[in-house]
């Protein structure tokens, strides 16, 4: 599913590589999701089912905001875009 998430990000205009050739956002967000899964000791399916809970947990008022805001809020942003991706997967809306 993370490969599909990466493809979704690329389709939405996120870059795979930066100008200097290093991996960019389309690689980073799936990586951040995998780090959250490992840190929480949950499966991707569990994260998907409880995405709102984890958005709140890693969000500005959540217990794990110090992690959520790391690297220009990459963990929190990855969760936000993962939720949008899941909505597209579920309902087929390209405008999610």
Regions found by a protein language model. Name each.
Residues 1-23:
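Short terminal alpha-helical segments
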């Amino acid at each position: 599913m993370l490969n599909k998430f990466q493809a979704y990000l690329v389709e939405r205009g996120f870059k795979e590589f930066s100008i200097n050739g290093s991996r960019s956002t389309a690689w980073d967000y799936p990586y951040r999701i995998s780090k959250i899964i490992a840190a929480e000791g949950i499966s991707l399916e569990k994260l998907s089912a409880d995405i709102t809970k984890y958005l709140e947990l890693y969000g500005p008022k959540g217990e794990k905001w110090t992690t959520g805001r790391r690297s220009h809020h990459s963990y929190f942003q990855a969760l936000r875009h993962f939720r949008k991706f899941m909505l597209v997967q579920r309902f087929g809306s390209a405008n999610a």
